């Protein structure tokens, strides 16, 4: 029986230059694997707790030495000797060990690092790719990437309110062709921005951060880039938004669009989305309303839920209980999947299974603070999520995931690229 022999955590850096955890697990056959935990910038208030040191003399208070120590002492002590390939049991032990609903004691960053590293070590020991270990024989589907090519909101220092403007290459037969087309659009967009004397500096997720004066200009220039690159707008490549509305709302559920000097209530904002969807081939809107505006979400879902994908990120925070509430209230029709929002691989799996059971789409997602770790690429294929958000075709921490998906596609001798089939069920 393969058991856990050793566990260790190290403070390393993420793509924003902030510290994060690298956890390593050694098994009884001396197989070793590591995992690096990501970190978000715009976070939902109900996310599991990311434990930081708050020691202002180190990393401006963002150190993770306490979380590392939790791995190297408490977690290590209680997990050594447990069966390695029983992921659910080990993850449940981690939850019990912490004793809080949101990992406030050990830190979700400490717990997730160990959970990820254990899965990777177990797969390695069994000589299986991670996607095959986690997903079994059914792990065959390559996800449609949602590439964030213009950044705004908290991901960029500009006047654009919406956090992410994305392209979705739906009209292609393979992942590699979809990615190639996306890269070509990205480079074409850069030339167009240069021609408009716009900055082509990039945000946290590799998208450009031009200083446009309103939230419509990015849709216009991206549409131009798609067509100039030689692709059919809406047919081969569609558009998607992550509004991150929780960053725009006040205590009265009024939404402040500073780039356009507008203050809108929930119904007015939904009307604005309807105008955009009518004018542009937008197939998905994420966090269209605040995580606390459930009444507004119900209206948004009623007005647009049969027409486009409505993704809950801050709304659900990868939490099965919150997703169940959304299902019961007919709110949204898709859930963003971020393992570090909930804490362990097993809890993430629970949320994905619940979503699939109720015909909610699943979007595997990175965080704005990432690393070279490509775990979510395997995870997306393992669970056939059908979609993945992992930034633009720039910045190596984003490219690491795309390159891993290209490897997986090659290993699967093509696999299945879901493409246009993604939204056909609805």
From Swiss-Prot:
InterPro entries tied to this protein: Enolase, Enolase-like_C_sf, Enolase-like_N, Enolase_C, Enolase_CS, Enolase_N
Keywords recorded for this protein, A-Z: Cytoplasm, Glycolysis, Lyase, Magnesium, Metal-binding, Secreted
Residues involved in Mg(2+) binding: 242, 286, 313
KW Methyltransferase (keyword) present: no
Compartments (UniProt record): Cytoplasm; Secreted; Cell surface
Residues the record lists as binding (2R)-2-phosphoglycerate: 163, 338, 367-368, 389
Cofactor section: Mg(2+)
CDD domains: enolase
Major site of localization recorded for this protein: cytoplasm
Class in the EC hierarchy, top level: lyase
Active-site positions on this chain: 205, 338
Any single Gene Ontology cellular-component annotation: cell surface
Pathway: Carbohydrate degradation; glycolysis; pyruvate from D-glyceraldehyde 3-phosphate: step 4/5
Pfam families: Enolase_C, Enolase_N
GO process annotations (BP): glycolytic process
EC number from the UniProt entry: 4.2.1.11
Functional description taken from the UniProt entry: Catalyzes the reversible conversion of 2-phosphoglycerate (2-PG) into phosphoenolpyruvate (PEP). It is essential for the degradation of carbohydrates via glycolysis.
HAMAP family with a match to the protein in the record: Enolase
Family of this protein: Belongs to the enolase family.
This protein's name: Enolase
């Amino acid at each position: 029986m393969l058991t856990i022999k050793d566990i260790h955590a190290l403070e390393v850096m993420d793509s924003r230059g902030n510290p994060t955890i690298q956890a390593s697990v050694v098994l009884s056959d001396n197989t070793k694997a590591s995992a690096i935990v990501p970190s978000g910038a715009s976070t939902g208030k109900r996310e599991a707790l990311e434990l930081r040191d708050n020691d202002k003399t180190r990393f401006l208070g963002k150190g993770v030495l306490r979380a590392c120590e939790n791995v190297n002492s408490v977690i290590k002590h209680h997990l050594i000797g447990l069966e390695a390939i029983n992921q659910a049991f080990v993850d449940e032990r981690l939850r019990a060990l912490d004793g809080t609903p949101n990992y406030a004691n050990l830190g979700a960053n400490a717990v997730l690092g160990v959970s990820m590293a254990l899965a990777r070590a177990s797969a390695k020991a069994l000589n299986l790719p991670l996607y095959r270990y986690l997903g079994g024989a059914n792990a065959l589907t390559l996800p449609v990437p949602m590439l964030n090519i213009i950044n705004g909101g908290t991901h960029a220092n500009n006047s654009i309110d919406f956090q992410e403007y994305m392209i979705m290459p739906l009209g292609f037969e393979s992942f590699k062709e979809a990615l190639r087309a996306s890269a070509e659009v990205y480079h074409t967009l850069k030339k167009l921005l240069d021609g408009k004397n716009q900055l082509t500096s990039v945000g946290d997720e590799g998208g450009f951060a031009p200083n446009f004066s309103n939230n419509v200009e990015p849709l216009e220039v991206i549409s131009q880039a798609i067509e100039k690159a030689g692709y059919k707008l809406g047919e081969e490549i569609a558009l998607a938004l992550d509004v991150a509305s929780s960053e725009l709302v006040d205590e009265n559920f009024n939404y402040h669009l500073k780039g356009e000097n507008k203050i809108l209530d929930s119904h007015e904002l939904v009307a604005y989305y309807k105008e955009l969807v009518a004018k542009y081939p937008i197939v998905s809107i994420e966090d269209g309303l605040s995580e606390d505006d459930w009444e507004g979400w119900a209206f948004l879902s009623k007005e647009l839920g049969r027409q486009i994908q409505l993704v809950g990120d801050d709304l659900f925070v990868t939490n099965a209980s919150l997703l169940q509430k959304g299902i019961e209230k007919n709110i949204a029709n898709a859930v963003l999947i971020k393992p570090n929002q909930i804490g362990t691989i097993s809890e993430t799996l629970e949320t994905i299974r619940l979503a699939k059971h109720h015909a909610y789409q699943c979007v595997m997602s990175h965080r704005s603070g990432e690393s070279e770790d490509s775990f979510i690429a395997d995870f997306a294929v393992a669970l056939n999520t059908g979609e993945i958000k992992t930034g633009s075709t720039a910045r190596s921490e984003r490219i690491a995931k795309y390159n891993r998906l290209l490897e997986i596609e090659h290993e699967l001798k093509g696999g299945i690229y879901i493409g246009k089939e993604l939204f056909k069920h609805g």
